[in-house]
């Protein structure tokens, strides 16, 4: 039997989750948000995926109560198809089948995808020990939410219903080891609500006690928030807050998969979590849009019900989105000359200093991608490897010669400058005589050509100048 994590991953990315209880792995999404699958609009046309019976078309079952002739406008999801549906509010979707000797003309559909978030599944209970080992009670008015509320008040994480009237609570994370059963084996109706499944004989249906809570704090990327007391009708005089805060989210997408609020005074609001400004207000008079986005990472969901009227409530699926910062892509098919130009532009300040930027360019007989030292170049074998080694030695030798030449030139210039001794104060008169000062040699070095040495008189020789002779006017 597969562990629960794998099973829950097949249900949805929107499994009911709080920050303290992370959701299972994501999927495309659940196909049901109600306990009895009344909202199922999937395309399963067999009573079971393995060993099931084919369903009859709803537009060919005129001898039965539910058909397209009686419900021509698609009520209950009926139409010219043979998909499983729940038009009468039974405990799960079903369909008509060809009659057999036992007289059965309809069957429940076992649909793995039609399992509301928070429904953990149907499991075997052999009683020694039971799947949930906490407290328990029995009631002839048992519903899913009365059992969940009882277990939640006792601070248990899980609630289980069995045989329609028994409620079990516990924190046992290994409940799945007792063995999973088909969902149709937990279709015994709850004694308090005949439209809800409450387990079976030796079969327990499990729920997360977060379902139907009045308030909570959500931080998961995706989750489902139910109205208070769900799947029962919400009570009167309810005031509930849920915080949805996903750090780093650029927006949060909301989708009301179920919305049944009939009283015009009952309302659902979405508020800016930072300013408490009302973003969206929904009530019995204003139906929500199918879906919408809120460009925030912190939203407050607020629900209010007055003292009269009740309804099924709502189920809202939210999905947060985080936008990754744009990343700079490396240049594609960039030539070596472009790389050299880019590096030279980044080092443009070197042109105004005494430092020299050395650039080795390839021989014209070699294409740019085979230039020595290029990272995109791959070594070859045989004669090609010797050619590459030769180019590498050539480049290093050229660089060494240029460096030594520059150093020698700088030394010669330094010696020449030092040879002109600064005269004493008594000799200043002689130094001002025409022709008394020596000629200053200025050296310009260009790596791509040769070294040029020529005489150049500094401007304003009659005035003292302490500039570095290497700095040109």
Swiss-Prot record:
Disulfide bridges in this chain: 32-114, 55-95, 84-109, 122-186, 147-167, 151-169, 190-198, 214-240
Residue span, WSC domain: 116-210
SUPFAM superfamilies recorded: Kringle-like, Spermadhesin, CUB domain
Residue numbers spanned by region Essential for apoptotic activity: 414-473
InterPro entries: CUB_dom (IPR000859), Kremen (IPR017076), Kremen_rcpt (IPR051836), Kringle (IPR000001), Kringle-like (IPR013806), Kringle_CS (IPR018056), Kringle_sf (IPR038178), Sperma_CUB_dom_sf (IPR035914)
Top-rank lineage group of the source organism: Eukaryota
TM regions (residue ranges): 393-413
Membrane-topology descriptor: Single-pass type I membrane protein
Keyword presence, Transmembrane helix: yes
Cytoplasmic face of the membrane: 414-473
GO biological process: apoptotic process; limb development; negative regulation of axon regeneration; negative regulation of canonical Wnt signaling pathway; negative regulation of ossification; Wnt signaling pathway
CDD domains: CUB, KR
SMART domains attached to this UniProt entry: CUB (SM00042), KR (SM00130), WSC (SM00321)
Signal sequence extent: 1-19
Annotated localization: Cell membrane
Extracellular domain ranges by topology: 21-392
GO cellular component terms attached to this protein's record: membrane; neuronal cell body; plasma membrane
Function: Receptor for Dickkopf proteins. Cooperates with DKK1/2 to inhibit Wnt/beta-catenin signaling by promoting the endocytosis of Wnt receptors LRP5 and LRP6. In the absence of DKK1, potentiates Wnt-beta-catenin signaling by maintaining LRP5 or LRP6 at the cell membrane. Can trigger apoptosis in a Wnt-independent manner and this apoptotic activity is inhibited upon binding of the ligand DKK1. Plays a role in limb development; attenuates Wnt signaling in the developing limb to allow normal limb patterning and can also negatively regulate bone formation.
Quaternary structure annotation from Swiss-Prot or TrEMBL: Forms a ternary complex with DKK1 and LRP6. Interacts with LRP6 in a DKK1-dependent manner. Interacts with DKK1 and RSPO1 (via FU repeats).
Protein's recorded name: Kremen protein 1
Species, as recorded: Mus musculus
Annotated gene: Kremen1
């Amino acid at each position: 039997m597969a562990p629960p994590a794998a099973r829950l991953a097949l249900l949805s990315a929107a499994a009911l989750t709080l920050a303290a209880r992370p959701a299972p792995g994501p999927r495309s999404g659940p196909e049901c948000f109600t306990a009895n699958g009344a909202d199922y609009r999937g395309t399963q046309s067999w009573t079971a995926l393995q060993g099931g019976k084919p369903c009859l078309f709803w537009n060919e079952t005129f001898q039965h109560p539910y058909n397209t002739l009686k419900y021509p406008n698609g009520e209950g999801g009926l139409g010219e198809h043979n998909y499983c549906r729940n038009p009468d509010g039974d405990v799960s979707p079903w369909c008509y089948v060809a009659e057999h000797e036992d007289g059965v003309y309809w069957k429940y559909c076992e649909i793995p995808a039609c399992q509301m978030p928070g429904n953990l599944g149907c499991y075997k209970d052999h009683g020694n020990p039971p799947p949930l080992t906490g407290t328990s009670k029995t009631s002839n008015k048992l519903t899913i939410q009365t059992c969940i509320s009882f277990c939640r008040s006792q601070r248990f994480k899980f609630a289980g219903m069995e045989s329609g009237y028994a409620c079990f609570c516990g924190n046992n994370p290994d409940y799945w080891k007792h063995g999973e059963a088909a969902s149709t084996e937990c279709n015994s109706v709850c004694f308090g609500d005949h439209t809800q499944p409450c387990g079976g004989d030796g079969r327990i249906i499990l729920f997360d006690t977060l379902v139907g809570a009045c308030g909570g704090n959500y931080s998961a990327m995706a989750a489902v928030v139910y109205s208070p007391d769900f799947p029962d009708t919400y009570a009167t005089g309810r005031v509930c807050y849920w915080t949805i805060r996903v750090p780093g989210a650029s927006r949060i997408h909301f989708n009301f998969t179920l919305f049944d609020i009939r009283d015009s005074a009952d309302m659902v609001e979405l508020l800016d979590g930072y300013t408490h400004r009302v973003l969206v207000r929904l009530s019995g008079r204003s139906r929500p849009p199918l879906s919408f986005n809120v460009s925030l990472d912190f939203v407050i969901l607020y629900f209010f019900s007055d003292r009269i009227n009740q309804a099924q409530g709502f189920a809202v699926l939210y999905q947060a989105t985080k936008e990754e910062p744009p990343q700079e892509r490396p240049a594609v098919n960039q030539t070596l000359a472009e790389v050299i130009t880019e590096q030279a532009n980044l080092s443009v300040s070197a042109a105004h200093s005494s430092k020299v930027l050395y650039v080795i360019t390839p021989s014209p007989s070699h294409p740019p991608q085979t230039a020595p030292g290029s990272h995109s170049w791959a070594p070859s074998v045989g004669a090609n490897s010797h050619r590459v080694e030769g180019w590498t030695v050539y480049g290093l030798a050229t660089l060494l010669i240029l460096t030594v030449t520059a150093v020698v030139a700088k030394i010669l210039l330094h010696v020449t400058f030092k040879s002109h001794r600064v005269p004493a104060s008594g000799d200043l008169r002689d130094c001002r005589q025409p022709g008394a000062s020596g000629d200053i040699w200025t050296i310009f070095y260009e790596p791509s050509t040769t070294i040029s040495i020529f005489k150049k008189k500094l401007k304003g020789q009659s005035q003292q100048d302490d500039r570095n002779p290497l700095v040109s006017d």
